[in-house]
Amino acid sequence: MPTHNSHSQPSSEDEGPPQSIIFGDHKLPEHPPTPNSPLQQTTNPFILESDGPHRQPHQSTIYSPGPFREPSTSRSPSHSRSRSTSPANSPGHSTISALASQSGVTASAGLGMTGADTAAASSKPTFREVPVPLSPTALSRQTSKSPAKSPRMGKGEGYLDPTILSVASGSRNSGKGKERTRRKGGHKYHSLHVQDEEEEEPPESDALRTRGKVGLNAYEKALWKWVNVDDLDGFLQEVYDYYKGKGIYCIVLARVLNLLTTFFVIAFSTFLISCIDYSKLFSSISTAEAVGRLEDVLVAQCITKGSFAHTLFLIILSAFFIFQVASFAMSVPRLLDMYRFYTHLLGVPDADIQTLPWPEIVRLIGDIRKHNPVTSLSNGQATALADMVGNDAKAPAKKLDAHDIANRILRQENYLIALFNKDLLDLRVRIPVPHVLTAFIPSSILISSADAPLPSLQSEPERKFLSFGANHLTKALEWNLRFCLLGYLFDRRGQVRKEFVREKRRKDLVQGLRRRFIFMGILNAIFAPFIILYLLIYSFFRYFEEYHKNPSSIGSRQYTPYAQWKFREFNELPHLFERRLDRSYEIAKEYVDQFPKERTALVMRFVAFIAGSFAAVLLVASLIDPDLFLHFEITPHRTVLFYLGVFGSILAISRGMVPQENMVFDPEASLNEVVRWTHYLPVEWRGQLHSQMVHQEFSKLFALKIMIFFSELLSVILTPFILFFSLPPCAAAIIDFFREFTVHVDGVGYVCSFAVFDFARYGNVDANQPETGLEGATGPDGGPAADGFAAGKPSRPTTRRTTSSSPSRLKHRDWRGNENKMEQSFLHFKATHPDWQPSDPSSSLFLDRLMGAGTRNRHGGGPVSAATGGISGSIYGGGGGGVGGRGLGVDGSVMAEMEEERLRAKRQSYERAWAKSSHLHRPDSSHSHPLRHPHSAASEIIEEEEGGEGDKGDDSIDGWSKRVKTDGETDDEEERERLWKDEGVVGLLQQVLGR
């Protein structure tokens, strides 16, 4: 098979290479090339040649050989690289596409061919450049030329086969100076076989031409969407939302039904409030001439005759409904893109999304990134060409593993998890009290600034606050926190603003955050009446059927929103977190119900007996005489049917509050099982699991649904006070947290430091020295590390511990998460994604030492106590909480007996290791930060294994190196001033509407 290799070097006369390229390794056609094969050239792929008198009767679609092809036999010197369109055949998974194909372009314009050339080259593009629309001058120049007969395509296996110059042209131009210059680049191009024009046309050519006129097929659209992703965070978020929504049909159905529900609530509430004359209705019922038709009590033109408040309420709800409809219509194209991405690129049909585990989706996405690395984000903000043919051409493509995907999807949620874990948000109701009124208010509900939990509050002058309620969170308050905090920290692309990691902007950022809190407090106070009315109507329609069908459900419980944020772990996706909590509901309800409630049980038994007696008598009487059921009135206008419903509801509620007679009382064992799933065990609870204090605190986290509902209604009134008075003093601590706990990860960007799983700085990689990190870091002279360096190694760029400007704010900062949150998150993430291998040596060292400690304990037969926060619920747990196969529970997966035994043994070793690691050594309270919870003095130290200390504290490891800011780095003053100027009320309102 004759081929020709040409080495070319781009010169100053040539255009630069394209920003996006594609290549493939498909098989070449069987026909050998002809020496006189002409080079084909097309017009812009997005401009179709108009019909004209010179158009040949038989013309087929022409496919360009690629942007780096040098024409061999061309009459005009202006012939150069052609802009290509894609072929007909869909590429395989190894194909890399930077631009989807555009077919249907005629070959009549600009094709220079000799008269003796009767054969046409069948070319498949090797490289393709983003098409640039032709100018009118260039278009007229091309259309003015005499069109030549179009060659016909040869049959090939794929559309990414490489091409080169023909042998004849290559030998003829080998001595040219321009060709010698190009030969220095080392780029290799391979020729394609051609097919004679007189040969029989392949049978699929008609289909190719027809499809080319239509446009891209579904696979090419999905591939084009993937390689042109410019916001990988947003794209992965859409991928996860599509997976969580169970496919396009479930998502569309859910959103349509949600729109219909909103419309029904608005329309039906308007009808009930404005369109019925209740005076006629009740008067007709009380008289003998009862009205029996609905039209007798209807109000004519009820909507136009309504009051101003009702009209305003209706306008606001209608605008909200129209906004939801518009949002749904705008989301349909993105849903179709996700459908094509899952179906054609991942190979996951819509019916299998509901049963496929998320780790398998992550693996498929990683395979696509491995086979198709050329995207708009191949190297951060660099172009795809720099990745493939630049200085890093020999470097492997950056991987996209489960950890990277989770950090991108949960980039914002990880900060909220850390804020709740560090207890930096004061969510209590705090109202300032004038000094003249402090003598008339009980001191139990008054606090002073000296008693405030945050340092910023302690520095304020003496002032009394009326405070009631504990830290609680509602959906309304959570939405406001997302807007005020995350909308302030992140830009429109979901990336952390660089100003937050620089201390020189601290004062402006604190003032800006305080203004956002105050503004949202005022805005919530204005719209509070409308929000309460809508919540009342919606909740009545939603919960009435549930409570009417099952009255005992009024005593059911669920975790509060505040408890969910306390339980959630770093890099834990919402559906995995919900599955973990769902497994704890039954045992949590058992723990709460079995606790001694003798007085309540005695009263409820009496109430159940009385209500059951009345209900039994009425039911027996109705069976004897059925007319009594509907016509006998016990009280005026109240029949037997009404009182049967009343006494039946009382009986069901009272029975639900009476514990079962055969229940075994063991609260400590029950709470241990709850901790197994929630992974939440404060230090204050340890050793007190049987006490009433722990029961009361857990009951606040696992509250009655009816109480949560009333809290949501009450929060509409209290949220303005929390935003206006409680949260503004926390602004300084929040801004400091954003700066101190933000790190830069190569290829991912700025993320929360706890989500990186950097045990050398924020965790317990060394069991004998658990408090690693900046508190224990020393400089070369044995003193404390300063200016972001510890022991000669680069530290976090956003922290300067011993500068004169901030001598005490960062000196005693607790760099570790409370309750070993990061360690638990790492172990659970590893269990959920078994195929993931941590790239950080400190993470691997932590895992190896835990497994080693568990192995020693297993051989020694040491007991494992679930009270220490055991991880059996998430690390290979046998009760469905483990991970078998691809993230499924062991009990729910079909595995061999040997695999089950291996996982069971690993589970036991991890449990024993966790039993020892949960009692990690902590420093005394005198060196802790005021925000930190007090820890028990008793601690247990894991026996340290030999070696493994060389990697401790290294911040530049396998792509997770921290970005160090140099002293000479400057900022763009114009952009900075534009970003941080006071936008005023109008700007904040625009941001609220944008959310």
UniProtKB/Swiss-Prot annotation:
This is Autophagy-related protein 9. The keyword Membrane applies. Residues 1-255, 333-516, 538-605, 660-705, 727-995 are cytoplasmic. GO terms for cellular component: autophagosome; cytoplasmic vesicle membrane; endoplasmic reticulum membrane; Golgi membrane; phagophore assembly site; phagophore assembly site membrane. Pfam families: ATG9 (PF04109). Phospholipid scramblase involved in autophagy and cytoplasm to vacuole transport (Cvt) vesicle formation. Cycles between the preautophagosomal structure/phagophore assembly site (PAS) and the cytoplasmic vesicle pool and supplies membrane for the growing autophagosome. Lipid scramblase activity plays a key role in preautophagosomal structure/phagophore assembly by distributing the phospholipids that arrive through ATG2 from the cytoplasmic to the luminal leaflet of the bilayer, thereby driving autophagosomal membrane expansion. Required for mitophagy. Phosphorylated by ATG1. ATG1 phosphorylation is required for preautophagosome elongation. Residues 179-191 have a biased composition (Basic residues). Residues 69-91, 783-808 have a biased composition (Low complexity). Residues 1-208, 771-817, 914-978 are annotated as: Disordered. GO terms for biological process: lipid transport; mitophagy; piecemeal microautophagy of the nucleus; protein localization to phagophore assembly site; reticulophagy. Homotrimer; forms a homotrimer with a central pore that forms a path between the two membrane leaflets. Residues 277-311, 627-638 are lumenal. It comes from Cryptococcus neoformans var. neoformans serotype D (strain JEC21 / ATCC MYA-565) (Filobasidiella neoformans). Residues 949-968 have a biased composition (Basic and acidic residues). It is found in: Preautophagosomal structure membrane; Cytoplasmic vesicle membrane; Golgi apparatus membrane; Endoplasmic reticulum membrane. Belongs to the ATG9 family. Keywords: Autophagy, Cytoplasmic vesicle, Endoplasmic reticulum, Golgi apparatus, Lipid transport, Membrane, Phosphoprotein, Transmembrane, Transmembrane helix, Transport.
